[in-house]
Amino acid sequence: MNFVFLWAALGGAIGSSLRYFVGKMMPSKFLMFESFPLGTFSVNIIGCFVIGFMGHLAVKKVFGDDFGIFFVTGVLGGFTTFSSYGLDTLKLLQKSQYIEAVSYALGTNILGLTGVAIGWFLAKNFVGIH
């Protein structure tokens, strides 16, 4: 039996729990900001660092595929998908695919924010939940 999906699911549960824990541990006041999503910010930065570190080890075959699926796809995927975005962008830059990297980075941010805004608008105005 192939346990790939089980490894990813188990890692995802751990990563999601860690994200919740980190988010709850962080204060909402940060530096000069009265309300700053420090938990999400911290999770994204930590996740990017860890996926960079683990991504390099994966390329060098320091650990097996099952552990990579468990940790990178599962734990980090549950912790933050922003880390995958960072790794994908870095891979494009490393291959000197600069136009693709910039397009991906800008497109992800602009279209992601646009998607959130449209979803919010539709829920507010058409579902009737104000």
From Swiss-Prot:
Q: Which residues form a coiled coil?
A: none
**Which gene holds the coding sequence for this protein?**
fluC
The membrane-topology field of this record reads: Multi-pass membrane protein
Keyword Transport among UniProt keywords: yes
GO CC field: plasma membrane
- HAMAP family for this protein: FluC
Task: Report which reactions are catalysed by this protein.
Answer: fluoride(in) = fluoride(out)
What is this protein's name?
Fluoride-specific ion channel FluC
Similarity-based family: Belongs to the fluoride channel Fluc/FEX (TC 1.A.43) family.
**Role according to the record:** Fluoride-specific ion channel. Important for reducing fluoride concentration in the cell, thus reducing its toxicity.
Name the source organism.
Answer: Helicobacter pylori (strain ATCC 700392 / 26695) (Campylobacter pylori)
Q: Which residues cross the membrane?
A: 3-23, 39-59, 67-87, 102-122
Cite the entry's keywords alphabetically: Cell inner membrane, Cell membrane, Ion channel, Ion transport, Membrane, Metal-binding, Sodium, Transmembrane, Transmembrane helix, Transport
Name the domain of life: Bacteria
This protein's record includes keyword Cell membrane: yes
**Example GO molecular function term?**
fluoride channel activity
Q: How is its activity regulated?
A: Na(+) is not transported, but it plays an essential structural role and its presence is essential for fluoride channel function.
Report any one BP term from Gene Ontology: cellular detoxification of fluoride
Q: Name one Pfam family in it.
A: CRCB
